[in-house]
Structures are given as C-alpha cells and as structure tokens.
C-alpha cells in the first residue's frame, strides 16, 4: 500500500462549529485487499493507538438503534467509538466504491471521539457499475457539476480512459 499527507479544503454547505473545518490535514492511504482486509486493518490501527473497542454495526442497524433513517452528527456523538458499515445507495456513496450484492456500498466510517475520523471504502472493480454510478450518484448532480466545470468531451474521455485499467481488489 501507500499513503500521503496533504491539506484538504472543503466548503461544507451547513458547517457545524467544532466539527467541520474549511482547511484540515488529510492522511490518505490505499492498500491491496477488499473491505474485510480494510476493516481488519482499521480495527488493528485503533487497537495499536490504545483506543476503546469499536462497536461495529451496519448503517441500517445504527439507524434502527436511533429510530431514524439518516444518521447525523448527533448520532455520531452518541456512538462515540464505533464503525458504520454498508452504506445504502441513497446516502450517495462515491461512484468508484464497490457495492455489496444487496446494493449497499462497501464503505466504512470509523467514529472516534464522536466524529467521523476515518472514511474509507473498497474500490470497485466493476467497470459498468462505476460508469453507471458516475452518472447517477446524487441524482446525477455530481456528473452534471463535473461536466459543467470541465466539459462533456473531456469528462467522458477521462472516465473511459480510467475504466480501461485492469482493476484488482483494493481499498483506502
């Protein structure tokens, strides 16, 4: 695998004080292996750092515990230390994330100190699924924005060039 440390800039539409920063350090990693290897590594990382055991539940199980459809920052605060897995499609998982047979994404959020601290997922190897979700996530608004910014010809050319790669199970 490999990693990098960079600075991230993000303009959240409705920032929560103390939770959303416009500029923050970002530690990113990519590793060989699917979501099971990813989950194992993240659990081992938390153990190595001496953090409390994580309560691990799917998105639907967490939302059922809180009697809600959508998890928000108040729910994450209540979770404290935990892991949210298997995100439903309506949460708009990124287009290159792998999907389970039930349509949920192979995505993991690690909640530490009541906040999403690690956001990770298995990358897809299914070229048709990636092409389709590129155009359909967030009701098509993501693709529309990228096309508006860079032009349809360039976006479609670069998407098709990306999809020509030979993909293998990886996550980050």
Where are the language model's segments positioned?
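A translation/RNA-centric and nucleic-acid-associated enzymatic feature enriched
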Residues: 1-172
């Amino acid at each position: 695998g490999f990693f990098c440390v960079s600075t991230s800039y993000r303009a959240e539409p409705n920032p929560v004080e103390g939770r959303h920063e416009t500029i923050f350090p970002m530690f990113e990693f990519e590793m060989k292996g699917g979501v099971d290897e990813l989950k194992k590594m993240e659990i081992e990382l938390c153990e190595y750092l001496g953090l409390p055991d994580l309560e691990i539940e799917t998105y639907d199980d967490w939302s059922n515990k809180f009697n809600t459809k959508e998890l928000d920052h108040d729910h994450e605060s209540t979770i404290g230390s935990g892991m949210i897995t298997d995100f439903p499609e309506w949460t708009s998982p990124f287009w290159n994330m792998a999907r389970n047979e039930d349509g949920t994404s192979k995505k993991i959020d690690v909640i530490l100190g009541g906040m999403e601290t690690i956001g990770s997922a298995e990358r897809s190897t299914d070229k048709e699924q990636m092409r389709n979700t590129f155009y359909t996530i967030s009701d098509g608004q993501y693709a529309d924005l990228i096309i508006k910014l860079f032009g349809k010809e360039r976006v479609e050319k670069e998407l098709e060039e990306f999809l020509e790669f030979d993909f293998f199970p990886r996550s980050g």
